[in-house]
């Protein structure tokens, strides 16, 4: 089974301009950390930076391939599934890993575990998440508890918040569901 990592880069970030190439805590460009994690992951065969701006090539590590993506994929109304679909039209694989530069603490072992779970066939996709057991509110209203019957924290339902470290999915699952998370995801 061929497994390919896709690291999308957009240099035109609205909130933090040029964030992906900015030096991080030790002066290393932010995008180097996820590249290293993907290169060190034993279950990834190829790693790609997918960006419309060729200036990012100066920040691509040895062993990582650069693939220029169409500029329309930089639009504000484009979501992850849009650029993944376009990437899959160019780079064929059985399993894809969508990893993000904004996760500089990603570990190769975490990525490998997600790939192994999907490759086993037990799951059609996987993603990394933070387990939360806390009082959640939206628009001034509680969403996971009744304030009239205030529960103990340990009795609250466990909610998972995606961390965007890695999304792993089979080609088959993406084509069936038209999204990176299938119908039976593994949550790491």
Feature map (PLM): residue ranges:
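Short, high-confidence coil segments that cap the C-terminus of an alpha-helix
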Residues: 44, 93, 122-124
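Hydrophobic targeting segments
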Residues: 2-7, 31, 46-49
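Residues in the short beta-alpha loop(s) of Rossmann-like NAD(P)-binding domains
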Residues: 27, 51-55, 131
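Conserved core of the sugar-phosphate nucleotidyltransferase
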Residues: 82-83, 104-186
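N-terminal nucleotide-binding beta1-loop-alpha1 segment
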Residues: 1-17
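Short phosphate-binding loop-to-helix
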Residues: 48, 54-97, 105-113
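Short glycine-enriched, charge-decorated loop/helix-capping segments at active-site entrances
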Residues: 19-25, 71-73
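A short, N-terminal amphipathic alpha-helix
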Residues: 29-47, 58
């Amino acid at each position: 089974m061929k497994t390919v990592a896709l690291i999308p880069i957009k240099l035109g970030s609205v909130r933090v301009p040029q964030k992906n190439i900015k030096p991080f805590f030790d002066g290393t460009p932010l995008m180097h950390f996820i590249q290293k994690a993907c290169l060190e992951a034993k279950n990834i065969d190829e790693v790609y930076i997918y960006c419309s701006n060729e200036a990012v090539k100066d920040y691509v590590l040895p062993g990582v391939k650069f693939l220029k993506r169409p500029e329309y994929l930089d639009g504000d109304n484009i979501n992850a599934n849009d650029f993944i679909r376009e990437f899959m039209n160019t780079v064929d694989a059985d399993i894809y890993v969508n990893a993000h530069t904004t996760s500089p603490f990603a570990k190769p072992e975490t990525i490998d575990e997600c790939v192994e779970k999907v490759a086993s066939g037990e799951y059609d996709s996987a993603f990394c998440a933070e387990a939360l057991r806390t009082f959640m509110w939206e628009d001034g209203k509680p969403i996971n508890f009744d304030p009239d019957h205030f529960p103990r924290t340990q009795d609250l339902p466990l909610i998972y918040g995606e961390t965007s470290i890695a999304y792993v999915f089979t080609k088959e699952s993406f084509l069936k569901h038209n999204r990176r998370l299938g119908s039976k995801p593994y949550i790491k």
